[in-house]
């Protein structure tokens, strides 16, 4: 930007201000702020990056305080703010439609028309709404943008047209999983076409059976698109 190399910070928690950019020369210095480096170590790193001929201990402390205020350090302040964001989401009974109006229409009529157009484009979907085969036991569907994956979506969910399964288990890709291998949620998922309720009893049974492989919270679902896209078709 304007001849300067910058790092643009993207924070899924939403703590770092949108559009926050960091001078690329400060990257190695930021990496050294691990609690083990001394002020002298950080001054030497500063000089190696040619940020300045010399930085006082006050300069380093001011810089570190700025990083901390921006939530770029794994500090008590960051952990407190992170825990509040996670707890606030955990307290919700619903998981809002994160991508409505961004990746697909937020208006029910426009979304229904788009889904019908996608489903009618696949061989499995060319019917009058009657089942074209037995109820599938499992489906493999994409979790990409609807327009980019329309053919694969049509082939997958066209096979469900005319069927009304009693229960659907949706296993989505977790792009932002932290702790655990799986993240379960009992939240209701509102969509422009209606609300999709979770089987809370079944979710709790899975949670108990999963033990330590299940994440202690469901925060990974907040901005995750892989399940949100499936629910539009379901």
Where does each model-flagged region fall?
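Short acidic/polar alpha-helix capping motifs at helix-coil junctions
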Residues: 6-8, 234
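Active-site histidine-anchored catalytic micro-motif
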Residues: 93-233
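Long, charge-rich, low-complexity alpha-helical segments
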Residues: 4-5, 12-105, 109
